[in-house]
Amino acid sequence: IDRILEGPLGTESLWPGLENVPGIVGFQMASRLAFENLHEKARRLKGFRDMLITEILEKIPETILNGPRGDRRAPDNVNISFLRCEGEALTIELSLRGVYVSSGSACTRRLLQPSHVLLAIGRKYEEAHGSVLMKLSSKHGFEDIQYVLKVLPQAVGRLRSISPF
C-alpha cells in the first residue's frame, strides 16, 4: 500500500504529521475525571434507577419494565412501556415539562417505529411503541428524580385521556 500523506523530515516513515499534544493531554484528563469515583457514581445511579423503576411501576398502571432488574441492568438505564400511550407523544409531553427522554435508540430516532430490540425480546408492537428510555447521569440529583416522578403520571394521564384505545 502506497502512502498518500508524508510526514516531516525524520518522521515521514512513522506518521504523516505532528501529534495533537493538547488533544492528548485533554483526553487524559477527561479519562481521569470520567473514571474518578466510578464505583460510587454507579452505586448512586443504581439507587436512582431502582427508585424510578419501583415508583413508576407502582404508581402508574399499565406499565411494563423492559429488561431485567438489579445488577443485570445498566446503572443509568430505565426503559418502560406505557400501555395506551405513544412513546413519541410522551417524549414531547415530558419535554414540555422539562424532562427529556427518548422513545427509541439514537440510530432510529427519525423513524416512528418501535424498537427492534424490544420486539426481539418478545414485546408486542403496541408495548414496544409505547416505550420510553430514560438515561441517568452523575449530574442528576434526588430532586430531579422526584420531579420526574411528579410529572410523569400527569403526562401519561393526559395522553391516555385523549387516546382512542
Report the location of each language-model feature.
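Structural signature of PLP-dependent enzymes
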Residues: 31-54, 64-74, 165
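Conserved C-terminal alpha-helix-loop-beta "cap" of PLP-dependent enzymes
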Residues: 78-133
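Predominant activation on well-ordered alpha-helical scaffold segments within soluble catalytic domains
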Residues: 2, 24-32, 53, 57, ...
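PLP-dependent enzyme catalytic core of the Aspartate aminotransferase-like
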Residues: 113-165
